Amino acid sequence: MIKKEQSLVKMLLPHIIAVVAFLFITMAYFSPMLQGKVLSQHDVTQYQGSAKEISDYYYNEGKTSAWTGSMFSGMPAYQIGVHGGSPNFLDYLEAPVKALGNTTAGPVFAGMLMAYILFCLMGFSPAVAILGAVAYSLSSYNIVILNAGHVTKAWALAYIPLIVAGFMSLFKNKVLLGSVLVGLGLALQIKSNHLQVTYYTGLLSVILFITYAVEVLSKKNYKSFLM
């Protein structure tokens, strides 16, 4: 029994170290937040203005409006900000990460976690997976869009590696693991509400499938492809 516990600890220890490292790197990068400083994000300010009518109606009337006149000549509110409703399990799943900062550190930390899962499933060592995950999430584009306030895009980008990891698992005939990762990653990404990134993720998935199909069929492994 003791040997099994020691083996489990030995297996989990690199991943625990990875999570702690991601947390340290993220909070070090966003350390000005700990001093009470706030990042000026244009799109967030613009969102607050466009959603004010919906927010005022909800807090004054206690009801959710499905329409707002604050954008263009009026448009559905679900693309801006809908209040009320019961949280689902995805909200609880994201809560610890969003506690780091929904519009700042949260998506960066999430991106590191998702990319780490992808690189580990690709067969890289934990050390290499950590480096790859940090490089993915701290890429200059992610920082630029956060500075501009493109928060929903940052969250959607953070979940791409999880979806890719799921498809790669499916290609390796790991049906249960692949289905869970694709389903969870896609649900979280759609919840982020940035359909442009979801569309690009779909294109990436198609390219991955074609690449896999060509590789398998070139080896005449038809049974594996059909399975």
Please place each PLM-identified region on the residue numbering.
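Transmembrane signal-anchor hairpin modules in multi-pass inner-membrane enzymes, especially those
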Residues: 1-4, 8-13, 42-46, 50, ...
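Start-transfer (signal-anchor) and selected internal transmembrane alpha helices
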Residues: 1-29, 223-227
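Short helical patches
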Residues: 5, 9, 93, 210-213, ...
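Membrane-interface starts of transmembrane alpha-helices
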Residues: 13-17, 95-103, 124-132, 178
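Membrane-embedded helix bundles of polyisoprenyl
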Residues: 22, 112-121, 127-215, 227
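Membrane-interface coil-to-helix junctions
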Residues: 25-115, 134-158
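Transmembrane helix-loop junctions in multipass membrane proteins, especially transporters and channels
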Residues: 30, 34-38, 173, 194, ...
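Juxtamembrane/interface motifs at transmembrane-helix termini
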Residues: 87-89, 165, 218-221
